[in-house]
Amino acid sequence: MYIVLGRFQPFHKGHAYLVEAALEKGPTTIAIGSSQSEPSMNNPWSVGEREEMIREWLGDREANIVHIADINDPPNWVEHASNFHGHGTLVTSDEDTKMLYEKSEFPVEWVNLSERESFEGWRVRATLKMLSTVHEKEAQKQVMLQTIPPKVVDWLVENDALYRLYAMSRDLEHVG
């Protein structure tokens, strides 16, 4: 079994690349971290919403999806997380996660992401925060499609999921 771990806030093309790599190798578990997080700019979507985004992207492809609450204790994280995602090979492009799992003698498959900095969650969320001030849906979509898979973009638009970012940043003015 292959495991892809992330917060998926939101599920973006970097995540899609990792999950594709895992699915090509065999049965895959997608582990959604920070499952208990209260809404914030770092974690704007609930674990249920993030799972919906992932399932929308997966379509008819099969993957097991599990939710993992944070424990804020890196030395014990792998033991905690493996209670939810089971044992297998972690597929990652994150150096810190790789080292943490290797230290726990977990097999790790390293995936090299070109332009990884473009797919960092904070950068994607910052762009979405800016887009939350734009009323024109097609303009929003065109920008989002650069870093987010089309089916997830559709989910974000259909569920008015960017509005939450605007509401969390009330000092922003709407444009366009």
How would you name each of these model-derived features?
Residues M1-G176:
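Nucleotidyltransferase catalytic core that binds NTPs
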